[in-house]
Amino acid sequence: YGLYLIFNECIKHDDFVKIINSSSYTAHITGADGTKRDVKWEPTNYYAKGEATPPDNVTIIGGKTGTTKGAGNCLILLTKDSSGNPYISIIMGAGSKPLLYQDMTSMLSKI
């Protein structure tokens, strides 16, 4: 429930939604010592990478992946149905990446 609460607050900010819906994002960072550098992030979720296909009636906006030994493979997504209604979907503890996306696609097909 905690992940849902955090993600639900994040998606209230247009900049956050824009970033998670991007093919990549580059941040311009200035360190405490004044040095500047650019850091580029690219999505790791299989839907964004074209390695998994969502159901036809669902549009993936973006989300966050995470994997640890203790938590397993996890994914939280913002999606919209064909009428534009938003949904937050979470899968936690999947034993593998393929199973994670199989479970998420199955859940999204219920929308």
Where are the regions a protein language model picked out?
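Penicillin-recognizing serine hydrolase domain
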Residues: 1-111
